């Protein structure tokens, strides 16, 4: 048989138990309040970090979108594939500039003219200057 503990019902012991329980309950309440405060603080910090991360991710996405030309932003994948399969080496704004200034024609004309002009003009100007100087020296004598 098990020996059961006898209950002592003295006034001192019952008061001691009640006081002890009251302190424990107050202590539990304090611990719960501290825990609630710590949790709310942690939630606040996590939310602020999450909003910061969300804003940086949003900014990165906007930067990536800004890198795509406006004409290609609404294209379907097949259209983009067709566009990229064409061997277009120059970007659209460069082709527009070339069309406006006709750079291909100007560059071919300049390359055809410049070497002959510089060679001919430099040799003829030097010969003219020598002939002029000879004739002027003869007239003075």
Curated annotation (Swiss-Prot):
Localization in the cell: Nucleus
Region entry Disordered, spans: 106-141
Keywords recorded for this protein, A-Z: Meiosis, Nucleus
UniProt xrefs under InterPro entries: Borealin_N
UniProt keyword Nucleus present: yes
Chain intervals with Low complexity compositional bias: 116-141
Biased composition (Polar residues): 106-115
Gene Ontology biological-process annotations: meiotic cell cycle; mitotic sister chromatid segregation
GO cellular component, one term: nucleus
The keyword Nucleus is assigned to this record: yes
Function: Has a role in meiosis.
Protein name (record): Meiotically up-regulated gene 118 protein
Protein species of origin: Schizosaccharomyces pombe (strain 972 / ATCC 24843) (Fission yeast)
Species classification: Eukaryota, Fungi, Dikarya, Ascomycota, Taphrinomycotina
Gene name of this polypeptide: mug118
């Amino acid at each position: 048989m098990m020996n059961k503990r006898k209950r002592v019902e003295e006034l001192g012991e019952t008061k001691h138990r009640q006081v002890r329980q009251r302190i424990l309950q107050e202590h539990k309440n304090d611990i719960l309040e501290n825990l609630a405060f710590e949790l709310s603080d942690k939630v606040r910090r996590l939310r602020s970090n999450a909003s910061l991360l969300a804003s940086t991710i949003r900014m990165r996405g906007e930067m990536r979108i800004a890198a795509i030309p406006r004409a290609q932003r609404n294209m379907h994948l097949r259209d983009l594939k067709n566009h990229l399969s064409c061997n277009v080496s120059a970007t659209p704004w460069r082709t527009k500039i070339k069309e406006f200034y006709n750079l291909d024609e100007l560059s071919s004309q300049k390359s055809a003219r410049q070497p002959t002009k510089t060679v001919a003009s430099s040799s003829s100007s030097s010969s003219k200057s020598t002939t002029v100087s000879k004739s002027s020296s003869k007239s003075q004598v």
